[in-house]
Each structure stands twice: as C-alpha cells, then as structure tokens.
Amino acid sequence: MNIRPSQIKHKQRIASFITHAVVVVMGVLIVSVLFQSYQISSRLMAQEGQRTSVQTSSLIQSLFDFRLAALRIHQDSTAKNASLINALVSRDSSRLDEFFSSVDELELSNAPDLRFISSHDNILWDDGNASFYGIAQQELNKLIRRVAISGNWHLVQTPSEGKSVHILMRRSSLIEAGTGQVVGYLYVGIVLNDNFALLENIRSGSNSENLVLAVDTTPLVSTLKGNEPYSLDYVVHSAKDAMRDSFIVGQTFLEVESVPTYLCVYSIQTNQNVLTLRDNFYFWMAFALISMIGVSIASRWWLQKRIQREIETLMNYTHKLMDLDTKSEFIGSKIYEFDYFGRTLEQSFRRLANKEKQFEDLFNFALSPTMLWNTSGRLIRMNPSAQIQFLREDAQNHFLFEILERQLLPTITNAAQGNNPSDVTTEVDGRVYRWNLSPIMVEGQIISIITQGQDITTIAEAEKQSQAARREAEESARVRAEFLAKMSHELRTPLNGVLGVSQLLKRTPLNDEQREHVAVLCSSGEHLLAVLNDILDFSRLEQGKFRIQKNEFRLKELVCAIDRIYRPLCNEKGLELVVNSNITTAAIVRSDQIRINQILFNLLNNAIKFTHQGSIRVELQLIEGDPLAQLVIQVVDTGIGIREQDLTVIFEPFMQAESTTTREYGGSGLGLTIVHSLVEMLSGQLHVSSEYGIGTRFEIQLPIELVEKPDAPQQLLPAPDPQPLFDKTLRVLLVEDNHTNAFIAQAFCRKYGLDVSWVTDGLQAIEELKIHDYDLVLMDNQLPYLDGVETTRTIKKVLHLPVVVYACTADGLEETRQAFFHAGAEYVLVKPLKEQTLHKALEHFKHHHGQKNAGLN
C-alpha cells in the first residue's frame, strides 16, 4: 500500500523528542526556581537596603537633633547665669570675655561656632568669630531681625566673602533677676559650612562609612578623605542600586524643630554582603545549567537504548498494516504506552475493515437509489436499486438515466465547487424523487459527491392538494372580507337614516310616550352599530390588518370618559359606579388611545349588561417604571359571574359562557375576543377570575410610554358647545347617492348654519366644482359612474382645485381610509353619521383650514 508523502521534511526519533521534552521541562523548572529565587532575593535585598536606609536616616536625624538639644540646654543655662547678667548690665566687655572663656573651658564640646549679645536692634557684645567666618557687622544685625521671632533654631543663610554661609541660630533672653527686665539677648550659632566636627560626630554614631552635608546637590562639608573609590560629585548625584555597586548611597533631608529644610545628608555604606549573595546566585545558576546539559545527554543515551527495540517492533507492525495485512496481530510491548498504542491500532484497523464492509453492504442493498459522482459530474458507480430504476427506457424509448443526469448535473457541479448543496427534486417517468447530496471530503478537498434519492411521488401529490386547499381558503377569506365590506356599506346606509332621524327627533317637542319610542329607536340603532363594528373589527384582526397607531394624549381623559359615559348608564339600572384612580391631570402618555378606550369600554359594556344589582368598580393605576410605565386596569362587577369551566371559552369568537346567555342578553360574542387581541397587540397581559353568581374581575396590565410631565398640571378642556362654529355661512357640496343619507347629512349641516348643495355622483360633483366655489366637500365612497376615491383624486391631483375634501365612507376599512388620504382627502368620517362625529369634523376644519376662510371664529 502506498503511503501518502508527509509534509514534514525534517523528522526526529521519539527518543530525541522525549529527551528534548525532559530537557525543556527541567530547564523550565530550574529557570523558574532560579527566577523565583532571584525575585525573592532581589525583593529581600531591596527591602533590606530600604530598611537600612530608613534606619540610617532616622539615626542621622536623631544625632542631629541631639546636638541641637545639647546646645539649646547649654545656651539656656548660660543665659540664666547671674555673673553674665551683671557683666552685661555693667557693660563690661572684659568680664563677658572672661565669663564665656570659662564656660567654654568647662564644656568645650558644647561651645557654639559663634556667639553674640544684643539689645533689641544693636549688638552689645560678640566673641569675634563672625569676622573669622567672614560675616560683616551689618549682616549680624540682619541675623538679629531674622532670628528674633521665637526661641527655636533657625536655619539662615548669609553672605560671606563672595559665598553663602549656612548657619543654625537660636536666641535666648537675658533677664535680670531683681527687676525681671530683659537686659539683652544671647545668640548662638552653628556654621554648617566646612563643619567637619559636627558631621564626623554624626557619622561615628550612624554606622556610615562617610557622610556628605549638602544643600540640594551642593556640598557644604563631607567626611571623605580623597582615597575612596567614589568621588564627592558621584555621591551627591548617584542613585541607590544594591545589585550594581559595592556601596549604598542614602539620602536624608534634615528637619530643624520638626520643620523640613533644604539640608540634605548623603550617607555611604558598604554593600559587600549583597554583592556576595549575587555572586553566589550566578555560580549556582551556571552549575544548574551545566547539570541540566549533563542530565540531557545521559537521558538521551538511556532512552535511545531502552525504547529503540520497542519502537522498532511497533514500526514493523504499522508497516504490515499499511500493506493491508489486517489479519496480523500485534505481539505486544513491555512499555505500557507502546503496547496500548499497538493494540488500539490493531483494533482500529479491524473496525475500519468492518465499516468498509458495512458501507459496501449498505450501498449495495439499500432500497433507495444511491449514486457516486466525481467532481466533474461523471458517474462513478450506482447501487443495484438505482440500476433497476434508471438503467432502462421509458415508453418513448428515452434512457431514464440520461433524463435524471440532466436534472442532477447542475446541482452536482455546484456542490463540487464547495457551495452548500440543497435537496433536488426530479421527475423521471412519472415518478418524483427528492435527492440528498453529500460531498465526500479528504484533507479539506471534495473528491466525490454521493447522491441518495427518495421516491416522494405520494408526498408531492399531497402537497399539491394542500396548496390547492390553501388557495381555496385564501380565496374564501378574501370573499368573506369583500362580503363584510359590502355588508358594512349596505347596513350602514339604512342605519345612517335610522340614527340620524332619531337624533333629529330628540331635539323636537315630544310627549313622554314619543320620547320613549325615540329612545328605543336610538338604543336599537346604537346596538346594531356596535354589533356591526365588532364584526368588522374581528374581520380586520383575523386578516392581520388591524394596526396600532400611537399618539400622545392626556390619560386623565380616559377617567373622565368613563364617568361621563357610564355613570348615566349605571344610574338607569340602579347600579353604583365606583371609579378609583391615581392618574393626575398632568400625566401625558404615548399609546393608542382609541384601542385603550375600546378595551375598557368593551369590559364596562359587559359589566353593565350582566350586572342587575350591586356595583361596578373600576380601578386605574399608573405605575412608573424604566423604561416603560404600567397602566393597570381592573373592572370588578357583582353580576351573574362565569363558571370555572367556561373561563376557557369566553375569549373564543362568537362564544358566550352559555347558550342561554346569548338568548337572554344578546350580543355578537366578539367583545372579549377583540379585547384579548387588542391587549396582545399592545404587549399587555389579561387576567380574569370569576365566581358564578357572585361576580367577575378583569385585570389588564399594559406597558405604556410616560411622556415627561409638565411643570404645572393643565386642566382638561371642556366638551365643545354644539353651537354654530362660523360667523359666515360656509358653502358645502354634499356628494351622496342615497337619499336617506343625504337627508340626514343636510339636516345636521343646517344646524351649524351651513349652505349645502347636493349631487348624487362623482361626475356631477366635478362639474359643480368647476362652476361654483365651495369651502368643503363631503364625499361618499360608493358612487355611480365614478367612485369617491377617484372623484377625490380628480379634484385634488388632476384639476388641483383648492377645496377641502372630507370623505364619508360606510365600510370603515383601513384600506378605504388610506385610499382617500392618498387621493388627497383631508379627513375621513365613518357612517352612520352622528351629530357628535360631524361636530368633531367641523372642529377639525375650523382649526386646520381656517386660514382659507376669513369667517371662522
């Protein structure tokens, strides 16, 4: 068996790999240990150096403070001596000289560098050392003023023969014991420049090799003798480095009376211990490296000798396997890993041979037609099932395989190029096959493609029948929608007359019996209109044409509408209406106001309908949240209630809890269905609980966008007074083919003082507008000759007449509404026409088109 050439050119034996691994592991461990030791040692050395430096600095400061304290005590005791006071009072300079000479002889170590006595502003006596340091008399007078602040030590700087002299000075008062008067001031000073004795005294007590006293980097005095391996300039400019240098340079800024100064003491200490530790570390690192090399050489020799024979045994067995001698057995190895590897290899090749036989059997005995193709689209082999089905001719003497090949070849070629293959459906000799394509890849390259077919003739026929049924269902839904639209128009047209005439009759003088008849007429018409609206809303929901339109509105309007509309209805039935709300007048929200009203009104209508005594309670709570607030609506009644088993069906269309409920209370059974759908469209939640004979509770939670509240709450505008809106008579053209609807519309318009002209079709309307000027056109939709939408488009976009068009449609569909707007209409009214609806439309006309009519209020 030919072995594929390896891509790796340079190869090594396993002994070399193991040796390298051992060397690498040992090297990493040794280097890690050495590195860790180095880090720990460096950290310890740095900490030790820092500790030593801190101790040295503290010791230097303590010695410096001790020296100043000794001078302070000596000065204060001298200032209290009676002999000194008497000599000063008598102004006897010789006695003063003798006194201080005797004092210095007794305590020479505490003698200051210079000493003088002054009054408040003049020098009375000095020891003459000032001239020794080159300090002039007038400079001493300046020092008196600079040190006259307190009895503390002062660091002062004074000129002396072209250079600066830094002096520590202190003043003590000389007080006569008999009178208590201050007769003078004793000044003592320590000159820091070239004060070797002071610095040597500090060095001897600080365990330092040398000290340098400097102002910043300018040396004042040092203990260096000149034979050191470092210079004075290097000391004041060097940095601490315990691993590089043989000495450590510390830096201490002196404090005088706990006040930081610019005086700096550089201390030099030996660093020999650290250097010795570093040298030992380097030695052991070199020793570890040499040891690692020796261990590596010995390991390689031992591994080469120990495992060479075992490796040769394993290699010989692999050569046999490559020659397809799958029956040979591995004799075993003394090394566990090699033995396990050889036996695993033996087992793997046996499994591979078994799988090849199983695959061959599966290919040959599969009932599904299976074929193997190369990347050029040429057939390599096919199984017996494919041979039986395609290696024959049809009734027209066409070779079936050639027909199949033409249909499969484009997809096979596409799959051979690396594209994801998709299932292919072919039809051969009246049979439909679905083919699954699977590329066979070796080392990332596609070498062949296997196709497996499935006879889906029966499934294809079922799919065709399913598609036909779907088309029939869609057509049925479309026909039903058209029927509902036509029914809406046909029902709304007579309903417009019923409601319009009943509203007109309400405003005429009537006796009680007639008023009751008119009320029954209005109630019946409103009930029929509500049923019609429910059916149309359900149709739009079912077709997915119901849309949520969000706008900003004052939420308090919802509470006011409940009280205004439903309190009279509850009073008529003797029910108590309780409305509780935390909604303020200032709360402005953004949502679909119409749909929220529709949800609440449907629930209240049901509550009033099914409640005969007791109360109806409405709870409205606005709960602020982030990012959306929650509007919680609860409607609780004491009505007939719902049985538990019926709670699952009340939201189904055209369903009520019981069949007797429909007969007794009426209704379409769509109210709760519409409520449930609207709540879902508003992303809300609906919960219902009920106890039969006790009452029902509905709770709705709606997410709602809370607009930022204004600074001050605004009062709701009162309902408009139904009075004439215009100072002059507006000319209105009514386009309506139905005489009843035209009569109702004209009657309503005349109540507002409008001059109405009536035409019955779109062509007449166009001709009328060409001849006369009108302020407003009320346009019906379904007109003879030319419908309302086309008539509006001709008026607005063809003739460009400057007249306002308000559409009046009876179907109430969103498609009709949008069609009118696209044609150019400014407003759409839905029949049956009501006085309140017309009033709202005229208000819209007044506010949006008033600039064209000077006669508007």
From Swiss-Prot:
Its main location: membrane. One of its GO terms (molecular function) is ATP binding. The keyword Membrane applies. SMART domains: HATPase_c, HisKA, REC. GO terms for cellular component: plasma membrane. Its EC number is 2.7.13.3, 3.1.3.-. The modification 4-aspartylphosphate is found at residue 780. It comes from the Bacteria. Residues 486-706 form the Histidine kinase domain. Coiled coil: none annotated. It catalyses: ATP + protein L-histidine = ADP + protein N-phospho-L-histidine. Gene3D superfamilies: 1.10.287.130, 3.40.50.2300, Histidine kinase-like ATPase, C-terminal domain, LuxQ periplasmic domain, C-terminal subdomain, LuxQ periplasmic domain, N-terminal subdomain, PAS domain. It is found in: Cell inner membrane. The modification Phosphohistidine is found at residue 489. Residues 731-846 form the Response regulatory domain. It is a multi-pass membrane protein. Keywords: ATP-binding, Cell inner membrane, Cell membrane, Hydrolase, Kinase, Membrane, Nucleotide-binding, Phosphoprotein, Protein phosphatase, Transferase, Transmembrane, Transmembrane helix, Two-component regulatory system. PANTHER family: SENSORY_REGULATORY PROTEIN RPFC, TWO-COMPONENT HISTIDINE PROTEIN KINASE. At low cell density, in absence of AI-2 (autoinducer 2), LuxQ has a kinase activity and autophosphorylates on a histidine residue. The phosphoryl group is then transferred to an aspartate residue in the response regulator domain. The phosphoryl group is transferred to LuxU, and ultimately to LuxO. At high cell density, in the presence of AI-2, the kinase activity is inactivated, and the response regulator domain has a phosphatase activity. Binds the complex formed by AI-2 and LuxP. This is Autoinducer 2 sensor kinase/phosphatase LuxQ. It comes from Vibrio cholerae serotype O1 (strain ATCC 39315 / El Tor Inaba N16961). The gene is luxQ.
